[in-house]
């Protein structure tokens, strides 16, 4: 993740920017480990001098729950957004149906990612390559949100850019936005 990372995050950022409710899948206590783009690049440079073949897990440290990460961004931006928790089974089924009908940008990866834990042990890369992440999840998300907030008008008019450099189409999420 970096300052210009948008895609589906652009939808989240729009909700935060407008002070809307953030609909959470389940209790929001699940964790997902991000990696800051500059940290990933730094790790790749360090790996160039590594004279062995190995597999490394890479990611941020001190991974907090989605509740904590989102509240950090909300609190540090002055947003009026608040978290609303919905039953995991109900939300996941709804996301699957909407995806199958072609009316949602959220696919199988997203419904797994936002409802389960994805945190990996990064001890090996730290010990063998001397890698240390520089940003935590909440700091990365805040940087990305701030970029969105400062550039939202130009972002709306972008053409021919990658999916991660523009805001994803909301589809059925537009209806959810009305109730937010």
Predicted regions mapped to residue ranges:
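Conserved C-lobe helical segment of Hanks-type protein kinase catalytic domains
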Residues: 15, 43-46
């Amino acid at each position: 993740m970096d300052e210009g990372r948008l895609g589906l995050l652009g939808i989240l950022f729009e909700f935060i920017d407008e002070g809307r409710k953030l609909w959470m899948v389940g209790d929001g206590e699940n964790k997902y480990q991000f990696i800051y783009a500059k940290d990933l690049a730094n790790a790749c440079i360090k790996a160039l001098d590594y004279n062995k073949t190995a597999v490394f897990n890479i990611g941020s440290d001190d991974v907090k729950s989605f509740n904590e990460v989102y509240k950090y961004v909300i609190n540090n931006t002055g947003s009026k957004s608040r978290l609303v928790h919905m039953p995991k089974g109900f939300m996941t089924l709804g996301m699957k149906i909407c995806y199958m009908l072609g009316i949602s940008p959220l696919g199988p990866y997203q419904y797994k990612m936002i409802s389960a834990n994805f945190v990996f042990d990064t001890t090996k890369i730290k010990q063998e390559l001397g890698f240390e992440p520089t940003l935590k999840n909440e700091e990365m998300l805040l940087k990305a949100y701030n970029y969105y907030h400062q550039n939202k008008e130009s972002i709306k008019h972008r053409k021919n850019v990658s999916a991660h450099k523009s805001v994803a189409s909301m589809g059925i999420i537009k209806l959810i936005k009305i109730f937010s």
